[in-house]
Amino acid sequence: RFGVALMGLGIARRSFLEAAIWAHHREAKGRLLVDLPLVREQLVDRLVDLEAAFALGFECAAAAHRSDGERLRRILVPAAKVRLCRLGVEVSGFTVDLFGGNGYCEDWGLTRLLRDAVCHPIWEGSENICALDVLRAIRREHAHEAVLARVDEALAVAAEAPGYLTEATEAVRSHRDRLAAKVAELDIIDADWTHAGAERLTELLLRTVQGALLCEQGATAPHKALVALRYSRRRLMPERAWDDRIAFTAGRDLIAFAEFDPVRAEQAAAT
C-alpha cells in the first residue's frame, strides 16, 4: 500500500516538472505562462501540495525508526495512500489541461501519466477502504495518540521558527485540538455515523499532520516556511487565502526551488 502511495507521488512530481518546464517556455498573450498571475498561483499551489505530500511520505518511511513507529505507520500509511494517489490524479490532470491539445494527444506522453495515476487510488485499497482503515486504527489500536504526539513534537520544533510562521503553527494547533476532539466523539456516536464521517476524519488528520510537518521544516529553512504558510492559508484557514501574496511575490523562485534568505522570506509572507 505504501509503495502504491509513492507511485502516486512520483507521478505527481513528474507531472509538476512537466508543467513547470512548459510554463517557463510557452507564451500566451506575449508573456510566459509562469508570469501569468493565475497560472503562477496554480503552479505554486501544486508545489505546496507536493511538498506536503513528500513530507507525509517521508514521515511514513521514517516511522520505522521511531519507538512509536508501528502505530504511526498503521494510521499514516492508509491516510497517505489516499492523499498521495489522489494528488497524482490531480496534478497529472492539471498538467494535461495546461498543455491544452498537446497534453491530450498521445505524442507528449502526458495522457499516459494521467491513465496510470487514475489506477492508483483504486489499487491496494480504494479511498473509502483506506479511510475506514484509518478509523479502525483509531478504534482498535489508539494509533491517533502517536499522531497527536508527533504533531506536538513538530510544533515544539516550529516554536523556534521566525515570527511570521506563527500564523501557520497556530492554525495547525487548532486543527490538532479539533482532531483530538473528533476522535473523542467516536466513543459516543453510533457505528453508522462513525463510518459516514471516516472520510472527513481522514482529511482532518491529513491536513493536521501535513501542516505540522511543513511547520517543522520551516523552522530551519525560509523557503520551507513560505511553503508551510501558504499551505496553512490554503488548507487550514482558507479565508486567509484571499489575502495571500506568496505566489504573486515569490512564486517564480518557489517553483524553481530557490533558496530564500530570512529577510526576503518575511517580506514574501506579509499580506
Task: Describe the role of every protein-language-model region.
Residues 1-271:
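Flavin-dependent oxidoreductase catalytic core characteristic
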